[in-house]
């Protein structure tokens, strides 16, 4: 057997590249402040799919998204009825104790809606403007300016969100004409990327000329192809220091949408690009809207960028694990942990860092369980019908019988109270 040559230097330490420096935007509602950019952690946001004119239905969905962990929630403002409902939505949320900032999503007629409904303009914490459909020709500059002036008047930050499906056609024609003059013209993909970036940066600079501080501007350039999104944001990050909103538009449904969004965003986040993310999933019929929030959180948490909820480590199963017990227990514990987080995150600071291992056999079960804060190694096929439990690397007991799931959940609860509750009590006593 050939021996490998020893190396003198240690392996490179894992981790993302340093975050790209950007100006920090501040999005407020009441006492709630969400910073996007600067040294703030990457922010998770989402969008409702209700009819905004239905104030009660929209407020209920915003509440669910916020309780799941969305730090900003965007709502469509597309009609006078929707604009008129925004103050009622905000009021209803405030009554429910939900202070998540609301972002108004405007297309085509945003300038008029904000002008005709000042209460809407005030109730929103941020505006999203699409420079591709704010108006055509001379009207474009006037209507864009009207929206920016409203943002300045009420002190609201703005996301200038460019989308390849609604790109400013006049600008695209200009970029194509410039490309035709090159000795070696770019291909169509490069022209499209250049048009997206140019639209975003030129619009941002115009907004600054009107009076909106650059620190209150967030940019996005969304496309639906993974490699195009990566290329667009790499170049956009190189050319400006505005905060950046990441998202793969029209990512799709189910596993395809999750995989595509993860493939694109994880590359950019690993390179230090991105200040806020939204996962644009097409929901399955009847599926909860909160799925997009959970996916966004799991991307950030699995990359080690932020922690939101205790994570369950579980093996995939194999011929040694013909029983479904460990699968059912893993799903049950993960659901339980997420359900508890709205209460735990205030009562037990740091609990979001906890790892729980639910393993299916003796091969990796005990070892993986020892590395977690709490771990259980369930018996595989042909193994003794016993499940050793490990706490902080030490075997504390062995569970048997029909109530393994219930008994393990009690151990998890006790660990949270004794470890994270003690830390909270100590911090309170020190104040």
Curated annotation (Swiss-Prot):
Its EC number is 1.17.7.3. Pfam families: GcpE. It catalyses: (2E)-4-hydroxy-3-methylbut-2-enyl diphosphate + oxidized [flavodoxin] + H2O + 2 H(+) = 2-C-methyl-D-erythritol 2,4-cyclic diphosphate + reduced [flavodoxin]. Pathway: Isoprenoid biosynthesis; isopentenyl diphosphate biosynthesis via DXP pathway; isopentenyl diphosphate from 1-deoxy-D-xylulose 5-phosphate: step 5/6. One of its GO terms (biological process) is terpenoid biosynthetic process. Gene3D superfamilies: Dihydropteroate synthase-like, Sulfite Reductase Hemoprotein, domain 1. It is an enzyme of class 1 (oxidoreductase). One of its GO terms (molecular function) is 4-hydroxy-3-methylbut-2-en-1-yl diphosphate synthase activity (ferredoxin). Binds 1 [4Fe-4S] cluster. Its cofactor is [4Fe-4S] cluster. InterPro entries: Dihydropteroate_synth-like_sf, IspG_bac, IspG_bac-typ, NO2/SO3_Rdtase_4Fe4S_sf. Keywords: 4Fe-4S, Iron, Iron-sulfur, Isoprene biosynthesis, Metal-binding, Oxidoreductase. Disulfide bonds: none annotated. [4Fe-4S] cluster binds at residues 315, 318, 361, 368. Belongs to the IspG family. Converts 2C-methyl-D-erythritol 2,4-cyclodiphosphate (ME-2,4cPP) into 1-hydroxy-2-methyl-2-(E)-butenyl 4-diphosphate. This is 4-hydroxy-3-methylbut-2-en-1-yl diphosphate synthase (flavodoxin). It comes from Ralstonia nicotianae (strain ATCC BAA-1114 / GMI1000) (Ralstonia solanacearum). The gene is ispG.
């Amino acid at each position: 057997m050939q021996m490998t040559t020893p190396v003198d230097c240690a392996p490179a330490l894992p981790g993302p590249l340093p975050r790209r420096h950007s100006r920090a935007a501040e999005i407020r509602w009441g006492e709630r402040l969400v910073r996007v950019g600067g040294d703030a952690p990457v922010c998770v946001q989402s969008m409702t799919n209700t009819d905004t004119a239905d104030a009660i239905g929209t407020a209920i969905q915003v509440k669910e998204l916020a309780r799941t962990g969305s730090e900003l929630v965007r709502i469509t403002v597309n009609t006078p009825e929707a604009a008129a409902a925004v103050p009622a939505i905000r009021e209803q949320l405030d009554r429910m104790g939900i202070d998540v900032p609301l972002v108004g999503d405007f297309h085509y007629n945003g300038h008029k809606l904000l002008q005709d409904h000042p209460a809407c303009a005030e109730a929103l914490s941020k505006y999203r403007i699409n420079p591709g459909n704010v108006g055509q020709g001379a009207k474009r500059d006037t209507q864009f300016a009207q929206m920016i002036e409203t943002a300045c008047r009420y002190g609201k930050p703005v996301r200038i969100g460019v989308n390849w499906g609604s790109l400013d056609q006049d600008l695209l024609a200009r970029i194509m004409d410039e490309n035709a003059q090159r000795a070696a013209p770019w291909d169509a993909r490069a022209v499209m990327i250049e048009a997206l970036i140019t639209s975003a940066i030129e619009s941002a600079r115009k907004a600054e000329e009107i009076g909106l501080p650059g620190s209150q501007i967030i940019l996005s350039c969304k496309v639906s192809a993974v490699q195009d999104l990566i290329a667009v944001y790499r170049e956009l990050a190189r050319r400006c220091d505005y905060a950046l909103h990441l998202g793969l538009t029209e990512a799709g449904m189910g596993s395809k949408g999750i995989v595509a969004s993860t493939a694109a965003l994880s590359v950019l986040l690993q390179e230090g690009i991105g200040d806020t993310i939204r996962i644009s999933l097409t929901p399955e019929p009847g599926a909860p809207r909160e799925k997009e929030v959970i996916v966004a959180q799991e991307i950030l948490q699995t990359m080690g960028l932020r922690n939101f909820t205790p994570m369950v480590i579980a093996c995939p199963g194999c011929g040694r694990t013909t029983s479904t017990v460990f699968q059912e227990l893993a799903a049950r514990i993960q659901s339980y942990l997420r359900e508890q987080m709205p209460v735990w995150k205030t009562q037990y600071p740091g609990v979001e860092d906890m790892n729980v291992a639910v393993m299916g056999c003796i091969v990796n079960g005990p070892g993986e369980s020892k590395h977690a804060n709490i771990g259980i190694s369930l018996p595989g096929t042909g193994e003794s019908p016993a499940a050793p439990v490990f706490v902080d690397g030490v075997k504390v007991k062995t569970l048997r019988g029909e109530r393994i799931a219930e008994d393990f959940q009690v151990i998890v609860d006790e660990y949270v109270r004794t470890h994270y509750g003690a830390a909270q009590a100590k911090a309170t006593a020190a104040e």
